[in-house]
Amino acid sequence: MEKMENDQTFSGRFFRASDPEAWFKFTLFIFVFISAGLFSTAVAQSLAIKGKTYQLRFSDEFNGTAVDTTKWQFRTDSKHWSTQLPLNNVVKDGLLQIQLKKETVRNMAYTGGGLISKDTFGYGYYETRMMTPKGAGWHSSFWLMGYDGSGGTSPSNTATEIDILENDSKITLGYRTNLHIWKGTHKDVGGEYVSSENLNQDFQTVACLYLPDSLFYYYNQKLVDKKEIGSVPKSGLNIWLTCIASFLGGTEKVDDALLPSALLFDYVRFYTLKKD
C-alpha cells in the first residue's frame, strides 16, 4: 500500500555521555517541561504527498478550554435518534470531546453533537486523529460537505459529499468511506469498507487527498481507497466532525449501559498545494 512521508526534519544539539553535567541539566529541563504540561508535538507546516508540497491552511489542535468559535459552528439538528447540542462539544485535555448522552431533547431520547467549519475549502489534504465512542448506537463521521447555516445537513446546498470516515459504533474493527453526488439527482457513488484496529480503544489517523480528478483515502498513512472524480460536480466544502444516535449499520438500539460516552478528536488539519 502507498505511504505518504512528512517532509519535516528535526535537528538539534545532542549531549555526549562525556558531558554528564550538561546531560543532567538537559534531562531535568525536559522533566520539568513535561511535568508542567508545556510539551506539545509540533504541527507539520508542510507535507510531501505524491511528489508535491502541501502547506498547512487550517488546523485545530484542540489545546484550549472551549470550542474556538472563530473556526467552528455547531450542529444543532434533530435527526435519527438524537438532538445535537452545542454544549455537548467540549474541549478538554487537548481533545475535542463530542459528548453523547441519554436525555430527552426535542422529542429525541438522546443527544449528540458536532462541529462544522466556518470556512469552506476545496482541493487538498484533510486529516484527523480520532477515537470512536464505546457502545452501540452512534454514527461517527469525519466528512466534507457544504453548509447552509441551518444547523443540520442540507444536500441542496452542496454538489458533493466526501465521507472520509463513517463508523457505526456497533462495529469496532472497521469503517466505511463514501462519496455522494447531490447536484441534480442524488447518486451514491459508493466507497470501501476499511478494516482497522479497534476504533474505540486507541486513536486512529484517517485522511483524504482531494484532487480535481481523483480522491485518495488513507488510514494510518496507508492508501485504502481511490475514486476517479473528473466528472463529479464540485463545490465548496465545510469540514464536519459529528456524532449522532442512529439506526444506521443495522443498529437496533443504543447501548444505554455505556452512556455517557464520547467521540474524541485529537486534531484536524487541512493542507493546500503549494504554489510554485
How should these model regions be labeled?
Residues 45-276:
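GH16 jelly-roll
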Residues 1-46:
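Bacterial Sec-dependent N-terminal signal peptides
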